[in-house]
């Protein structure tokens, strides 16, 4: 896309929001409580603050304020307000390609924020536990928050990921013409690295005329030991392993498709 000469500040708002899910099987009530305590500590407010602060570094934002909170019995949230970092617009890369993991990227932000909320969850029947992290990166300026996508997914356990990206508002060029988007985008997948794309099955649902983009990701490889908490698959019978595998796959597909699936 040809670079635009704008009248004043770039007023477009670009919002990236996504849910990241980690799935686990805990055989007993004690193991379920242990998993919730483990994941709650692993992603406490301090750790999340470190992740989001590094995200600010990746996209070149200045941190204005940090609000963080750990909740009882579980969960945490962090919100960071960020400000613009003046840069030469000629140095900003507007092309569609994966962001860094974290190499330096320059951004131009104003009235922007980055926030995360966590939701550990379990049920006494079935042994299934889930951890969900809701993340939103919203920026005003010339660069898309999609540049931070690779880093954030790699930092969190990601069996399933749902991503939404939207550009809102408009900005004017020097001739008074309104522009409702200032960069080319066909798919969120174009901002992911090849190694990440090779790990997931993905599907897009995009509304191009509204500048709304949606991608869902489901981990391809399934290794049962990755999903067991304090239990080894080899300590289970073959029937138990098959039942647990079926339950985990059903849980993952239901989250991925966003609907309950009847047992076969």
From Swiss-Prot:
GO BP of this protein: spermidine biosynthetic process
Residues the record marks as site: Cleavage (non-hydrolytic): 111-112
Gene name of this polypeptide: speD
Molecular functions per Gene Ontology: adenosylmethionine decarboxylase activity
Family: Belongs to the prokaryotic AdoMetDC family. Type 2 subfamily.
Keyword annotations: Autocatalytic cleavage, Decarboxylase, Lyase, Polyamine biosynthesis, Pyruvate, S-adenosyl-L-methionine, Schiff base, Spermidine biosynthesis, Zymogen
Active site: 112, 117, 140
Swiss-Prot/TrEMBL cofactor(s): pyruvate
One of the record's GO cellular component terms: cytosol
Name recorded for this polypeptide: S-adenosylmethionine decarboxylase proenzyme
NCBIfam families, per the entry: SAM_DCase_Eco
Source organism (scientific name): Salmonella paratyphi A (strain AKU_12601)
SUBUNIT field: Heterooctamer of four alpha and four beta chains arranged as a tetramer of alpha/beta heterodimers.
Changes after translation: Is synthesized initially as an inactive proenzyme. Formation of the active enzyme involves a self-maturation process in which the active site pyruvoyl group is generated from an internal serine residue via an autocatalytic post-translational modification. Two non-identical subunits are generated from the proenzyme in this reaction, and the pyruvate is formed at the N-terminus of the alpha chain, which is derived from the carboxyl end of the proenzyme.
């Amino acid at each position: 896309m040809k670079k635009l000469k704008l009248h004043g500040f770039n007023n477009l708002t670009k919002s990236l929001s996504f849910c990241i899910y980690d799935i686990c099987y805990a055989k007993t009530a004690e193991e379920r409580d242990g998993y919730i305590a483990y994941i709650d500590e692993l992603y406490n407010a301090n750790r999340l603050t470190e992740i989001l602060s590094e995200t600010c570094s990746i996209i070149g934002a200045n941190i204005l304020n940090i609000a963080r909170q750990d909740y009882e019995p579980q969960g945490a949230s962090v919100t960071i307000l960020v400000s613009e970092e003046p840069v030469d617009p000629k140095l900003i890369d507007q092309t569609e390609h994966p962001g860094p993991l974290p190499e330096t990227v320059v951004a131009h932000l104003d009235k922007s924020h980055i926030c995360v909320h966590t939701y550990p969850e379990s049920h006494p029947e079935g042994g299934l536990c889930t951890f969900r992290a809701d993340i939103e990166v919203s920026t005003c300026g010339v660069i898309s928050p999609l540049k931070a996508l690779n880093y954030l997914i790699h930092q969190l356990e990601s069996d399933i990921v749902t991503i939404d990206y939207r550009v809102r508002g408009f900005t004017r060029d020097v001739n008074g013409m309104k522009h409702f988007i200032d960069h080319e985008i066909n798919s969120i997948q174009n901002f992911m690295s090849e190694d990440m794309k090779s790990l997931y099955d993905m599907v897009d649902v995009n509304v191009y005329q509204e500048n709304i983009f949606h991608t869902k990701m489901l981990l391809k490889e399934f290794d049962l030991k990755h999903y067991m908490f304090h239990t080894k698959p080899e300590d289970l019978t073959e029937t138990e392993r098959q039942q647990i595998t079926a339950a985990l796959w059903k849980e993952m597909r239901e989250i991925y498709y966003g609907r309950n699936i009847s047992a076969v």
